[in-house]
């Protein structure tokens, strides 16, 4: 995991992630990089270098789309460099319960939307995943050995004691 202090520093994030990757020297490791504004170009560069990335702290579908763009640009750059795409893995981790905690605080106690925004966001994000990892450009990258960047539903334990412990898991199966 990249140090949180570096969340707003692209170059330092890339340097630390590269150092971690080289020291660990394990092909099944993913380096956590936050989905901050500075994290987006870091994700692109790390994928270009062939470093597996778990994008963390995702809360919005719009930012998810930017994360996917960074991933795809990194793969495309790597392919242009004549480097292999096989074996590169990435996940985009949505922090579900944190979304509802933030939104619920702004809703009235009796709002029917309480505990629903994160699930709705995850469903929209999954549809975007299906859309973005299809079509001619994706088929070209896939033909070169690229894998999709998998959505990962993180923070699935509810923070509100009024919600079922399995709220997110059940709704997203």
Feature locations, PLM:
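Catalytic alpha/beta core domains of metabolic enzymes, predominantly
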Residues: 51-172
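Amphipathic, non-transmembrane alpha-helical secondary structure
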Residues: 11-18, 40, 44, 48, ...
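Acidic (Asp/Glu)-rich catalytic clusters
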Residues: 18-25, 47-48, 82-87
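Active-site beta->alpha loop and helix N-cap motifs at the rims of alpha/beta catalytic domains
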Residues: 1-42
């Amino acid at each position: 995991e990249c140090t949180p202090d570096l969340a707003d520093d692209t170059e330092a994030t890339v340097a630390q992630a590269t150092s971690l990757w080289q020291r660990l020297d394990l092909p099944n490791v993913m380096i956590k990089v936050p989905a901050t504004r500075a994290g987006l170009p870091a994700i692109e560069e790390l994928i270009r270098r062939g470093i597996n990335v778990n994008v963390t702290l995702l809360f919005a579908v719009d930012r998810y789309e930017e994360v996917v763009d960074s991933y795809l640009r990194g793969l495309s750059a790597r392919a242009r460099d004549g480097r292999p795409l096989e074996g590169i893995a990435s996940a985009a981790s949505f922090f579900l319960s944190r979304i509802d905690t933030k939104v619920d605080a702004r809703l009235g106690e009796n709002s029917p939307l309480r505990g629903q925004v994160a699930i709705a966001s995850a469903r929209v994000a999954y549809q975007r995943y299906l859309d973005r990892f299809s079509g001619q450009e994706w088929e070209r990258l896939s033909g070169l050995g690229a894998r999709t960047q998998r959505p990962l539903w993180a923070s699935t334990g509810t923070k509100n004691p009024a919600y079922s412990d399995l709220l997110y898991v059940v709704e997203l199966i």
